């Protein structure tokens, strides 16, 4: 249930206005102009004053019994539904749901242009227009913060860092040796620009390699909570536009991640590897160092990648192999275990 402590309901909204707002509706249904929607709820909890959505077929059975006044469904949905529920067919029902959330809700907590008294901002730092700098934020010399940005409490922005317009840096984020584009969202506890894990070993002693690279992050990138991104030792660590990086991800020094790629929680990418454009790495995936993962590659959860992968391949397992080979290996292993157990019983 949505809590009014944190989010403000902007409704009610007329159903006709909702359909007009969503734009990508296929053959908009004819609805009475007086139908009013008060809230968004899941199918199981929706009442006759609510709108719901269906994007995962696993929940389609609830469409038969839901009390929702309307439901956004995929354009090719052919299942059964409550005859009293208006079906709104969308090109992408989950995307439409995301737009609907923005239409109905806004966070209670808001920020206005202000630098809190407890913040420490160097005289040589440049803070753009309409920025909010929270309690106990530290901004060092020669930092540039773009217009309309928010730096929340306890964050540290190191010397010379450049952050673009409309950035949101949540609490207790640390950023050093970094250049960050516009529209960045960096969630609480992320660490960006620290030295990578690089050593030279001489006579049994591991000597630290001084890192002289930086982290370059493109436009419209999201970095999850407690994710760590090391700066390069010689070549820069680069994250291109439109990337989405989940919580608790480790990105090693000199890694390059291509435009639009998605990295799910607890994944780790070792130094100097390249991830192509629009790749997807599942949870707990590990990528060894100095590899080239080409555009459009998908790696299933817990996959361990030890060699280069060609474009648009789907792999899984550890060591990672083509996904169908991995499934076959799993089936064969299961059969071998059954056979072995039956022999032991005899």
Swiss-Prot record:
The keyword Lipid biosynthesis applies. It comes from the Bacteria. Pathway: Bacterial outer membrane biogenesis; LPS lipid A biosynthesis. GO terms for molecular function: N-acyltransferase activity. GO terms for cellular component: membrane. It catalyses: a UDP-3-O-[(3R)-3-hydroxyacyl]-alpha-D-glucosamine + a (3R)-hydroxyacyl-[ACP] = a UDP-2-N,3-O-bis[(3R)-3-hydroxyacyl]-alpha-D-glucosamine + holo-[ACP] + H(+). One of its GO terms (biological process) is lipid A biosynthetic process. Catalyzes the N-acylation of UDP-3-O-acylglucosamine using 3-hydroxyacyl-ACP as the acyl donor. Is involved in the biosynthesis of lipid A, a phosphorylated glycolipid that anchors the lipopolysaccharide to the outer membrane of the cell. Belongs to the transferase hexapeptide repeat family. LpxD subfamily. This is UDP-3-O-acylglucosamine N-acyltransferase. The gene is lpxD.
